[in-house]
Amino acid sequence: MPTISQLIRKGREVLTEKSTAPALKECPQKRGVCTRVYTTTPKKPNSALRKVARVRLTNGVEVTAYIPGIGHNLQEHSVVLVRGGRVKDLPGVRYHIVRGALDTAGTQNRNQGRSKYGTKRPKKGAATAAKGPVKGKK
């Protein structure tokens, strides 16, 4: 505990908050080009093949970004939009690719949480036809 005279001489040091997505340089999103698209395995209790991409951002920084949703159309040289947000079971993956923006297509056949996966609102007639026949009616 400092004395009053020590506080007068030095003052309190203000704690600076460390950014969770430093490569974005305080921007909400950044554009980038995929340099490599591949799958990787998660940390210990989990088991899967997670889809990730190595992206070179417009500021020259190269980051690893997660591709959310089922299926994607990304390949090398695809232009993508990158936002912050880490993937807990993938070490070193601190960014997400935004679905439905630039070269990234939205996820198909999605009815809930569509805004997170860039899926357009289904047509009125198409939604019931896609579900199949209604049980109980002949």
UniProtKB/Swiss-Prot annotation:
Pfam families: Ribosom_S12_S23. GO terms for biological process: translation. Residues 125-138 have a biased composition (Low complexity). The keyword Endoplasmic reticulum does not apply. Residues 105-114 have a biased composition (Polar residues). SUPFAM superfamilies: Nucleic acid-binding proteins (SSF50249). The modification 3-methylthioaspartic acid is found at D89. Residues 101-138 are annotated as: Disordered. Keywords: Methylation, Ribonucleoprotein, Ribosomal protein, RNA-binding, rRNA-binding, tRNA-binding. GO terms for cellular component: small ribosomal subunit. GO terms for molecular function: rRNA binding; structural constituent of ribosome; tRNA binding. With S4 and S5 plays an important role in translational accuracy. Interacts with and stabilizes bases of the 16S rRNA that are involved in tRNA selection in the A site and with the mRNA backbone. Located at the interface of the 30S and 50S subunits, it traverses the body of the 30S subunit contacting proteins on the other side and probably holding the rRNA structure together. The combined cluster of proteins S8, S12 and S17 appears to hold together the shoulder and platform of the 30S subunit. NCBIfam families: rpsL_bact. Belongs to the universal ribosomal protein uS12 family. Part of the 30S ribosomal subunit. Contacts proteins S8 and S17. May interact with IF1 in the 30S initiation complex. This is Small ribosomal subunit protein uS12.
